[in-house]
Amino acid sequence: MKIIKRNGQEAIFDEVKITNAIIGANKEVVETERLSEEEIDNITNDIKYKCQKMKRALSVEEIQNLVEDELMKLNAFSVARKYITYRFQRALARQSNTTDDQILSLIECANEEVKQENSNKNPTVNSVQRDYMAGEVSKDLTRRILLPEDIVKAHDEGLIHFHDADYFSQHMHNCDLVNLEDMLQNGTVISETMIEKPKSFSTACNVATQIIAQVASSQYGGQSITLSHLAPFVDVSRQKFRKEVKEEFETIGLELDDEKINSLAEERLKKEITKGVQTIQYQVVTLMTTNGQAPFITVFMYLNEVPEGRLRDDLAMIIEETLKQRMKGVKNEKGVYITPAFPKLIYALQENNIEPNSQYYYLTELAARCSAKRLVPDYISEKVMKELKVDQNGNGQCYPSMGCRSFLTPYIDENGKPKYYGRFNQGVVTINLVDVACSSKRDMNKFWQIFDERLDLCYRALMCRHERLKGTPSDVAPILWQHGALARLKKGETIDKLLYGGYSTISLGYAGLYECVKYMTGKSHTDPNATPFAIEVMQHLNDACTKWKEKENIDFSLYGTPIESTTYKFAKCLQKRFGKIEDVTDKNYITNSYHIHVTEHINAFDKLTFESQFQKLSPGGAISYVEVPDMQDNIDAVLAVMKHIYNNIMYAELNTKSDYCMACGYDGEIQIEKDENGKLIWVCPNCGNKNQDMMSVARRTCGYIGTQFWNQGRTQEIKERVLHL
């Protein structure tokens, strides 16, 4: 059995330390009020038993709380007072420097919480450690100086989650849609170097990767680009190759007709497209940003984003090559092709690619094979999205998420035209719906009262995020604010005008709708008797966003939070506050956003149809998924799911497994098992390899693909997922 020390380091549970701490307090009281040795031993044994029953590693603070509880039960109030006083004195001493232990444990790779905090960061690498060290300082400043005490307390207790506190001390925003078109067509500046309009497709791809890296280093959230912004450069290369071919043959005294020139130019063009797409794939996975990780980049593939004709056909060629290269994968250090985490791919399903006889159906078939093997692309239904995202002109719009799942709301610019690329999200604060429910003790009136109190906390926390960005000069990130990624502001000009009027969004996140409904009604939100309550909860969240938007002229939007690592924190906080309630707080995770619980048996089609109604109520972002087995030999079934997505839900993905054991070469599913301490570990079923450095495991974490393993809560959630096909 293990515990988590205050610095995040994992240690063996040592009951002697509990006994010694009680003995120390016991000696400080008069003899008539002291506990006997037997009573002290009983307390220690009771605490050990309770820790074992929790089936997870408790923190030192949680164990100390148990000690206090046991002392109070025995009416040993004097001993309890001494124990609490000593604990308080030690806490004061620790507060004199709040970061040393955390940072030292990071450097020595001994911090278990950080090791599993981000499934796309390797905490043993120097560059990642530097980012985490800076993050510890930022969190310390945020907690002690920048945030009100009640918001910090609510965050610590798991009532809300104030996201990305490790970046809050700086004036940084969350995620965005990069205006690659403006930067490539009109030029940009990277590291004080003028970059003019590219003269070829491959150069455009190279410039795009440099932009991606610069943008990632200037923000903490994900970014998205669209391949349609690269498509015009295909014809730039085509015309260049036509000219080259013609000149080469004229040099040797030969004349070719246009048909032959075009044929030779197209051959060279295909190689150019392969080279350009390969540049993006390999640059993205090998670049290291100042965040200590590869850029969290999403690439959008949407045919109808460009006019019909040659430009759309050129875009189709880029999409085809992108899918082929992703299906192939990238080689790991052993030379084996594996599934890369990035870039995340999104493929738009539309009228001209969804039916077997449609013009671009061959791309949809290729996308299906790619999803079956490499977990991407994810899918946006143009049809459904245009029904949900209607702008002020009354036109439905289709555009990508910012990174994983955060969506902008429709916006019309000063020229009366829809605008999406160049917009961003200011940040996220998430409400723990499970805690709202459990705090109400099933009293419905009390539930709505507590709900509103927690929403007020979220509102004030979100305004802290907004105020942190307000007054930010464009100079803090020239690539974003001055050179076209998001705007073309002047030097010294603040970004304030971009924070209001719907240009950017700010997100109220929510988590644990399933557990909330389960506690209040005794039923899953899939039960027809419980679904109306779930919808009512969602509507209440949206109503709060509407009220705040009208008050502040800021685009508050409801967001289905992925809670990648926060799921474990919320679960631990809930168990600490309410104990283990069956099907509510008895897991080491809570359910993402509105999702059906991972253990609930339901087929893929019913799941997507049911969840679509909640996706409509998450305008700030949400994604649904279905868990599937190896589908590489059943592409027809994958295509059937994709067709269902097109007709029923805006944004969805298929989760499968893509693993490799470097110890024995096994490429099937790596299993999750418990070790002798009850900790969940990854094990190769073929050779028994347990060394995470000797295996490649790719799982959908929360929209992105994670490849650096997960905390115990998320690992349990992954282990318990049932198949939907």
Model-inferred region functions:
Residues 273-277, 281, 518-519, 714-720:
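Metallocofactor- and cofactor-centric catalytic cores in central/energy metabolism, strongly enriched
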Residues 14, 673, 701-704:
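Conformational switch/transducer regions in large eukaryotic molecular machines and scaffolds
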Residues 5-10, 29-36, 53, 412, ...:
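A ubiquitous short alpha-helical element
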Residues 1-110, 719-724:
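Charged, amphipathic alpha-helical regulatory modules used
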